[in-house]
Amino acid sequence: MSNTGNQSCLMGAEDTLSFLRKNQLREAYCNNLWDGARKTLATLWDGHGAIWHGYEIHGLEKIPVEGPALIVYYHGAIPIDYYYFLATLIIQKGRTCHSVADHFLFKIPGFKLLLEVFSVIHGPQEECVRALRNGHLLGISPGGVREALLSDETYPLLWGKRKGFAQVAIDSQVPVIPMFTQNVREGFRSLGTLSFFRWLYERFRLPVAPIYGGFPVKFRTFLGDPIPYDPNITAAELSEKVQQAVQSLINQHQRIPGNILRALLERFQLKPKGH
């Protein structure tokens, strides 16, 4: 086929995709105002991820078409990769995912309504179990703010002895799906590892540390195999099992230590690490 023919096919595909997206948004607003708002933001985030990070997601088929699952992920300095993941879920799967966020976000003026619209909860186990028993997906990062601030380009998991998320999965009788995004630490980096900011967080639990970045590095999100519900496993055992699964994704898909220049060049790499 000629170059002109290829360009025509590409433009036709883009026009078709744009038409379908517009129809989806129109239908969403007709059905529900908040649903329309969610899909509009999802479309914007999806476009941003594609343009700025060449965002890819591998293993999306492991997310159930319906029914609950607990998605456990590594927390970057700014979890922008998680927003791209949520957008992809809405657009490609037609599903929303409830998310657990640190309580300090709910104290930001004017932010609470936005969090409620996007089904963000501050994490009591009972509320998490309720969301899963109602058939929703639920995303949580056991490392939370601590991992966001104090982890670095060597990608250590800072979960401590946290096992509440595992107890939630057991009580809800749902599978756990591990998730990790390649180069998320190269997109944004935190200076929380510096002794002063570490002391502030450890002593006063103040999530205050300079963050720099916004670099257009390659982002690839990888979903691991679901860990099925096991009635005979303890929360501590499941927590360890999930941590090993997330660590396995890091080992397989992330070059350690992370490097910003290399992550930028990976925008031009056809095959991800581990493939």
Task: Put a short name on every predicted segment.
Residues 2-88, 93-119, 123-126, 194, ...:
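Membrane-anchoring hydrophobic helices of lipid-metabolizing enzymes
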